């Protein structure tokens, strides 16, 4: 092994991308390597507590330039609706001079990126190796981001007849297609021009999709494993939730969260609340206030709060999701199946019910429910609407001990969890990935 290397990280300005990049940075720093993490100034405060090695991981703040159409002060994807994503993308591209100045001054060995398609070209000029690092699933990349791919249509040779879109997914495809064409160009350009492809996944879950991407791009795909964060024992579950959950029997509580990007329409939000009530089980729902509402309370169905006051909570702020999933009282996780939440569900003991909204979430859902058969998807109408009855039926089907479907997904989930948490599996991915990077840097230095 040669000397330690210095890596730059430049992820898309969304916390769903920056946070797993920082988890990877922690793994590199744990092995003695240095990381310079480029991000918007506003994002630094929210990420600092995830930095376990502040002496080796240095945040390098970028000034986000003004772009017509981008609201004043918006610096991350959580500051804007999805429809304004193209303006944040334009602002990211305008940071190129700042990024290049940092590369010139600090001379890293590697630079990790995802949507900034111009990084490989810039990196080559400075003799830096570029690594495109995906924090979305391999199935999404295989379905959407191979050369010549078309939104919603599986490409030739795609390795699954189950991980696909259905007719009622048109609502999500339509929403995403607003800026899909440009995003597709950015990512496929990055894939074609980068030195190495890496994905936050493991072959036990997505091996055939990784093999397919390798064949399409004719280069090795490096896997990091899911890069789950280390448990933060210094920050136990808030007393508010610990005391509330302790009231209920083991495995009886439904926990529902739909990610930071999803804001429901008011009528769909109310249907979600009523579906939870219909199960008759205790529940904790953590979602953003719906469109047109400033608070959760003003949007709740009439009489709902009084009816569920002893066994149901709807919360509009951030919660400690991994710690809630680990609480003995929680037995079911209703999730949008974003890639991070997907992994958290797989290594939990909870039954899994899926309610996807965005394109990659839909494909992750089909992987989980149809390919791996470890979860149940909530049935939707052609418009994308789900009813309180369909939500309640999905939850009841996995929570009922006598349900044939519930027993099937419970058995399959338990087997898969056993594989994923087996000693050495996930650390093995990290070790091999870091060793490969070290060899890449050593070989480059010998050129």
UniProtKB/Swiss-Prot annotation:
UniProt binding sites for UDP-alpha-D-glucose: 260, 319-321, 336-344, 358-361
Keywords, in A-Z order: Glycosyltransferase, Transferase
Enzyme Commission designation: 2.4.1.-
Annotated source species: Arabidopsis thaliana (Mouse-ear cress)
Protein name: UDP-glycosyltransferase 79B9
Top enzyme category: transferase
InterPro entries: UDP-glycosyltransf_plant (IPR050481), UDP_glucos_trans (IPR002213), UDP_glycos_trans_CS (IPR035595)
Family the UniProt entry places it in: Belongs to the UDP-glycosyltransferase family.
Example GO molecular function: UDP-glucosyltransferase activity
């Amino acid at each position: 092994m040669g000397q330690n290397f210095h890596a730059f990280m430049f992820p898309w300005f969304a916390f769903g991308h920056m946070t797993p990049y920082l988890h990877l940075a922690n793994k590199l720093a744990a092995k003695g390597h240095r990381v310079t993490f480029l991000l918007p100034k506003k994002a630094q405060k929210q990420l600092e507590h995830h930095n376990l090695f502040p002496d080796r991981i240095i945040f390098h703040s970028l000034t986000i330039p003004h772009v017509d159409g981008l609201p004043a002060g918006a610096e991350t994807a959580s500051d804007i609706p999805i429809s304004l994503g193209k303006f944040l993308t334009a602002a990211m591209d305008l940071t190129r001079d700042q990024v290049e100045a940092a590369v010139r001054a600090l001379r890293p060995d590697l630079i990790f990126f995802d949507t900034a398609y111009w990084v490989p070209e810039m990196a080559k000029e400075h003799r830096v190796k570029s690594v495109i690092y995906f924090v979305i699933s391999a199935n999404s990349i295989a379905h959407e981001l191979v050369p010549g791919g078309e939104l919603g249509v599986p490409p030739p040779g795609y390795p699954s007849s189950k991980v696909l879109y259905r007719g009622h997914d048109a609502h999500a495809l339509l929403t995403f297609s607003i800026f899909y064409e440009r995003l597709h160009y950015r990512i496929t350009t990055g894939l074609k021009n980068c030195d190495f492809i890496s994905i936050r996944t493991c072959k036990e879950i997505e091996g055939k999709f990784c093999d397919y991407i390798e064949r399409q791009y004719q280069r090795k795909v490096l896997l990091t494993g899911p890069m789950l964060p280390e448990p933060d024992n210094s920050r136990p579950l808030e007393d508010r939730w610990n005391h509330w959950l302790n009231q209920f029997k083991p495995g009886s509580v439904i926990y529902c969260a739909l990610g930071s990007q999803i804001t429901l329409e008011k009528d769909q939000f109310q249907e979600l609340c009523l579906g939870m009530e219909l199960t008759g089980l205790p529940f904790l729902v953590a979602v953003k206030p719906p469109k047109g509402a400033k608070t959760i309370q003003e949007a709740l169905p009439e009489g709902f709060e009084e009816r569920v006051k002893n066994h149901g909570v709807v919360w509009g702020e951030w919660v400690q999701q991994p710690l809630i999933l680990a609480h003995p009282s929680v037995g079911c996780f209703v999730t949008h199946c974003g890639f991070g939440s997907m992994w958290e569900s797989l290594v939990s003991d909870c039954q899994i019910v899926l309610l996807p909204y965005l394109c990659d979430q839909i494909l992750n859902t089909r992987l989980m429910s149809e390919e791996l058969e470890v979860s149940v998807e909530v049935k939707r109408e052609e418009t994308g609407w789900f009813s309180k009855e369909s939500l309640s039926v999905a939850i009841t089907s996995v929570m009922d001990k006598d349900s044939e479907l519930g027993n099937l997904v419970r058995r399959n989930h338990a087997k898969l969890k056993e594989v994923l948490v087996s000693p050495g599996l996930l650390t093995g991915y990290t070790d091999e990935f870091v060793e490969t990077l070290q060899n890449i840097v050593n070989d480059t230095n010998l050129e």
